[in-house]
């Protein structure tokens, strides 16, 4: 919040998402670490996931450290958000509908349920919030004109998962 004042308004609610995870035992395994739509290819025989090198700015030891697979799910959830936010030719409501359809289909396939997930499961919501906060900092430093994308996502997420 010090570097990006716009985060200050979300700090308490985001911390509540993280605090809800304290003491929980979460499954961990080797993960992709930088999973987003740009790391997928559609071939004749289906979808392929590429570039398992992890987050480029992390050390090799950090990239090899087991983590929750929900970190990769959160990365893809946020990737759908970026795709929707930058789509042209669609009304804002249609972009949001497309994003929610993609997120619910993807997460539903990951957890084998048809129930809407983001905003209802505090574990995944915390990982999505963590990714969105990272994106706010990234955009602030590198693409300030895009900072609204993760800020809007963070606003929607904390509105779903918490109350003041």
Locate predicted features:
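Metal-dependent nuclease catalytic cores in nucleic-acid-processing enzymes
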Residues: 74-84
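Short, polar/flexible loop-turn hinges at active-site or ligand-entry regions and domain interfaces
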Residues: 85-93
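Catalytic-loop Lys-Pro-X-Asn motif of eukaryotic-like protein kinases
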Residues: 37-38
């Amino acid at each position: 919040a010090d570097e990006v004042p716009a985060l200050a308004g979300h700090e308490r609610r985001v911390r509540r998402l993280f605090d809800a995870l304290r003491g929980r035992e979460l499954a961990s395994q080797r993960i992709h670490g930088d999973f987003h739509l740009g790391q997928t290819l559609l071939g004749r025989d289906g979808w392929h996931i590429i570039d398992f090198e992890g987050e480029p700015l992390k050390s090799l030891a950090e990239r090899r450290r087991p983590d929750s697979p929900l970190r990769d799910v959160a990365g893809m959830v946020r990737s759908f958000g970026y795709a929707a936010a930058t789509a042209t030719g669609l009304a804002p409501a249609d972009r949001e509908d497309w994003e929610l359809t993609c997120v619910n289909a993807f997460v539903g396939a990951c957890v084998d349920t048809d129930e809407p997930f983001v905003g209802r499961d505090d574990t995944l919501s915390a990982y999505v919030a963590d990714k969105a906060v990272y994106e706010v900092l990234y955009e602030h430093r590198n693409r300030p004109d895009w900072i609204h994308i993760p800020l809007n996502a963070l606003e929607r997420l904390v509105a779903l998962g918490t109350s003041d």
